[in-house]
């Protein structure tokens, strides 16, 4: 129930009323945005457990606290530190207030806390966030929903906090689609950003590969082998109906352009080149032409350029095509084998897979002008298939570091690598986006 959550500005947080915090009676997001630069250290955060106002709210408090903590920890941008013993102090009037001196003494940059109540059978979570050095309130907001939506309520607050502190769209509410052979067939599955809410999308009992979510998350393009040869299919994510995009020859490895067109590799003219296909399945135009196979299209956010893989000079390398001028230039030169480009949502980097001279397969990022090639993974087997989070602050990828191929996530700079979900079989070829 993503759409049933109600977010409203808090006039006066019950949490604040309990402890007499100095906060004006208004939501304050927008008055304070501390943009966290890429590569900066983690934000030191003290998180107070939501104070339950008795009754049903007491039963919800522990679960909401856990969901908020796990959600914020997943982002990799927070250093969660325990609160000081003297978190509150009592003034001359006998009122309890936040002890900002104590928070500063333990290195806390941000404090977040709130109250929890039951109102007409619904959960009401009121949260307040402070920048501790200046004792400045930076966010006041109330979130409400049904009791079975505690996870979504918690993530709504997490999303607001991350947006406030980084200026970027967060991962909360986003989804990852991927391929798994858990059932004995290669089918496409989806899960929440943190590996929860696992769902099987295709049931072809055949081979489904290279899933690609559209930028708005409403459609899923993938390669399907049900007919015996690879063909392009598109799933409507609202009702999960699947339609075939019928073209003669082979159709593989789709990628979405911002205008709704799908780029895919077709072979009906002999060579395997990349074509643009309209939403109705008709051909728009051919965009690459070479003797070697061209595949793995990934577009810049504005849709004017396309990164792709070509073996036109021998080994596969990543190229960039300007769709306006038709000019193509080679992007990658490190390693003997460069594939699977994924253009970042901000447009400033492209992640890709490299086979290095020592035989290791690792993930790199590079700027679109060819500078700044940076290795993100190392010392592990078969790191491949990178896909950016919608905000560009994380990457999901496939790794065989524990034997079978599994999904992992990491920060955009390669930090905080960890396995995404526990699931039987192998998981591969992830694509990350929001699904309405």
From Swiss-Prot:
SUPFAM superfamilies: TolB, N-terminal domain, Tricorn protease N-terminal domain. Keywords: Periplasm, Signal. It is found in: Periplasm. InterPro entries: 6-blade_b-propeller_TolB-like, PD40. Disulfide bonds: none annotated. Gene3D superfamilies: TolB, C-terminal domain, TolB, N-terminal domain. GO terms for cellular component: periplasmic space. Residues 1-27 form the signal peptide. Pfam families: PD40. Transmembrane segments: none annotated. Its main location: periplasm. Belongs to the TolB family. This is Protein TolB homolog. It comes from Chlorobium luteolum (strain DSM 273 / BCRC 81028 / 2530).
């Amino acid at each position: 129930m993503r759409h049933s959550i109600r977010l409203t500005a808090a006039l006066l947080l019950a949490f604040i009323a309990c402890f007499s915090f100095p906060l004006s009676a208004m939501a304050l997001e927008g008055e304070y945005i501390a943009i966290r630069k890429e590569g900066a250290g983690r934000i030191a955060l003290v998180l107070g457990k939501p104070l339950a106002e008795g009754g049903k709210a007491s039963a919800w408090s522990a679960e909401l606290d856990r969901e908020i903590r796990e959600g914020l920890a997943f982002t990799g941008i927070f250093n969660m530190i325990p609160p000081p013993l003297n978190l509150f102090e009592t003034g001359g009037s006998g009122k309890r207030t936040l002890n900002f001196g104590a928070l500063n003494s333990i290195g806390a940059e941000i404090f977040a806390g709130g109250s929890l109540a039951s109102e007409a059978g619904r959960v009401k979570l009121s949260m307040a966030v402070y920048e501790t050095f200046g004792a400045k309130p930076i966010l006041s907001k109330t979130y409400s929903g049904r009791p079975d939506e505690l996870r979504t309520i918690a993530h709504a607050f997490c999303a607001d906090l991350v947006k406030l502190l980084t200026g970027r769209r967060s991962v909360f509410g986003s989804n990852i689609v991927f391929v798994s052979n858990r059932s004995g067939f290669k089918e496409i599955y989806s899960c929440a950003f943190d590996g929860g809410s696992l769902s099987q999308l295709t049931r072809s009992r055949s081979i489904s590969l290279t899933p690609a979510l559209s930028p708005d998350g409403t459609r899923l393009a993938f390669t399907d082998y049900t007919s015996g040869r690879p063909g392009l299919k598109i799933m409507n994510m609202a009702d999960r109906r699947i339609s075939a995009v019928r073209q003669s020859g082979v159709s593989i490895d789709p990628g979405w352009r911002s205008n709704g067109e799908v780029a895919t590799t077709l072979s009906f003219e002999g060579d395997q080149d990349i074509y643009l296909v309209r939403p109705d399945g008709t051909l728009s135009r051919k965009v690459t032409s070479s003797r070697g196979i061209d595949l793995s299209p990934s577009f810049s956010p504005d849709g004017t350029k396309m990164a792709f893989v070509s073996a036109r000079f021998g080994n596969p390398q990543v190229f960039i095509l300007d769709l306006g001028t038709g000019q193509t230039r080679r992007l990658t030169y490190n390693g003997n084998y460069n594939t699977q480009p994924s253009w970042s949502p901000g447009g400033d980097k492209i992640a890709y897979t490299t086979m290095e001279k020592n035989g290791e397969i690792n993930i790199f990022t590079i700027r679109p002008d060819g500078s700044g090639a940076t290795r993100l993974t190392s010392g592990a087997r078969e790191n491949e298939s990178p896909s950016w989070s919608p905000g560009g602050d994380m990457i999901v990828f496939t790794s065989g570091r524990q034997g079978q191929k599994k999904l992992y996530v990491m920060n955009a700079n390669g930090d905080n690598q960890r396995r995404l979900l526990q699931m039987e079989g192998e998981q591969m070829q992830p694509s990350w986006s929001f699904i309405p």
